[in-house]
């Protein structure tokens, strides 16, 4: 089921072009895009909708609605972004985070990003996701802070501070997603050998 919020005339015009029957959908007419976004997020806030889905609205205004103090979806925690990809040639879904919201996440924010991602993975059928904190190299280099963070995240997971997943980093992209590359590099001692579910990017530019 879906509730469509926006310019009803345009919604019906688009649906007609797609030969889509709207008889089973509720339509809330609101021609103003920003107001439509606020009304849509309020539906989720009030429990009338399970999910707030972005339409043709600027990401800036979309996020403003999500973070609205009166009707938004604030929980008090860190807001992060997860992309879910189905890629030909890869036998599983890939979860990429955070490639939209967090610019230069701190170690503490990376912990929260991972914790935010786990329920998304669970909802998609991945019970214990393998999380690869990405870096340019697979070894810790003090001159490359992202590798230090990756190693610390791995340790924190091993110590039970990040439950519900397996974290192994730092890892390069090829080691994270390509079993042949992992085999070629002799990564037989790694928890992740080309079979990562989650790619944790060090910053928004890498993502």
Where are these regions (language model features)?
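Anion-binding alpha/beta catalytic cores of soluble intermediary-metabolism enzymes, centered on
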Residues: 1-192, 196-202, 206-207
């Amino acid at each position: 089921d879906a509730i469509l919020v926006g310019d009803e005339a345009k919604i019906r015009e688009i649906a007609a072009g797609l030969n889509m029957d709207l008889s089973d959908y509720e339509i809330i007419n609101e021609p103003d895009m920003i107001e439509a976004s606020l009304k849509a997020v309020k539906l989720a806030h009030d429990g009338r909708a399970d999910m707030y889905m972005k339409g043709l609205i600027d990401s800036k205004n979309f996020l403003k609605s999500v973070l609205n103090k009166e009707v938004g979806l604030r929980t008090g925690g860190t807001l992060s972004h997860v992309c879910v990809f189905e890629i030909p040639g890869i036998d599983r879904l890939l979860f990429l985070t955070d490639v939209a919201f967090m610019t230069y996440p701190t170690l503490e924010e990376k912990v929260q990003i991972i914790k935010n991602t786990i329920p998304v993975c669970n909802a998609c059928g991945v019970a214990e996701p393998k999380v690869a904190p990405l870096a340019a190299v697979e070894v810790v280099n003090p001159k490359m802070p992202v590798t230090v963070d990756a190693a610390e995240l791995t340790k924190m997971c091993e110590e039970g501070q990040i439950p519900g997943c397996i974290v192994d980093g730092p890892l390069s992209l090829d080691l994270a997603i390509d079993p042949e590359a992992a085999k070629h590099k002799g990564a037989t001692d790694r928890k992740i050998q080309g079979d990562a579910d989650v790619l944790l990017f060090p910053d928004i530019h890498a993502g």
